Amino acid sequence: MADPEKLFRVDVVTPNGMIYSHRGSIVDVRAIDGERSIMYNHVPLLTPLVISEVKVKRSREMDSRIDHIAISGGYIEFSNNVATIIADSAERARNIDISRAQAAKERAEKRLKEAREKHDERTLERAEVALRRAMNRISVYNTKGH
């Protein structure tokens, strides 16, 4: 059985409130400078995150449950064995509505095409971000094995 002293709290917070709060042995995130794996007693850290998947391994066992969370960027702060992820939006894989995510992808692709035709750089950038968010949600949903 896992030693509870080697687990730390992982919280994911959005403007809408707490999305996730559990104890974990490892949290994997994608920072702007690459992948990071954080474990118990990691050095204090504050770093920006990109649109990506957060993975939280719930115990130290090899076959431990892994929770998958889609985030739309944000920050991770780790200190005193508490990892806090602050994101504009976040969704656990089990809560993702795949039909809504696919519809968002289609809307973003349509806006992207229109922006390219009109040479509208501002709309193009926003459509690219919307597409990355939708693709991330779909990817996280599929990672869970649905």
Swiss-Prot record:
GO molecular function, one term: proton-transporting ATP synthase activity, rotational mechanism
Main localisation: membrane
Superkingdom of source: Bacteria
Gene3D superfamilies assigned: ATP synthase delta/epsilon subunit, C-terminal domain (1.20.5.440), F0F1 ATP synthase delta/epsilon subunit, N-terminal (2.60.15.10)
InterPro entries the UniProt entry points to: ATP_F1_dsu/esu_C_sf, ATP_synth_F1_dsu/esu, ATP_synth_F1_dsu/esu_N, ATP_synth_F1_esu_C, ATPsynth_dsu/esu_N
Membrane topology, from the record: Peripheral membrane protein
GO cellular component, one term: proton-transporting ATP synthase complex
Compartments it resides in: Cell membrane
Keywords of this entry: ATP synthesis, Cell membrane, CF(1), Hydrogen ion transport, Ion transport, Membrane, Transport
Signal sequence annotation: none
Any matching Pfam family: ATP-synt_DE
Record's function text: Produces ATP from ADP in the presence of a proton gradient across the membrane.
Subunit: F-type ATPases have 2 components, CF(1) - the catalytic core - and CF(0) - the membrane proton channel. CF(1) has five subunits: alpha(3), beta(3), gamma(1), delta(1), epsilon(1). CF(0) has three main subunits: a, b and c.
PANTHER family, A to Z: ATP SYNTHASE DELTA/EPSILON CHAIN, ATP SYNTHASE EPSILON CHAIN, CHLOROPLASTIC
NCBIfam families listed in its UniProt record: ATP_synt_epsi (TIGR01216), PRK00571.1-3 (NF001846)
Family listed: Belongs to the ATPase epsilon chain family.
HAMAP family membership: ATP_synth_epsil_bac (MF_00530)
Protein name (record): ATP synthase epsilon chain
Organism: Lactobacillus helveticus (strain DPC 4571)
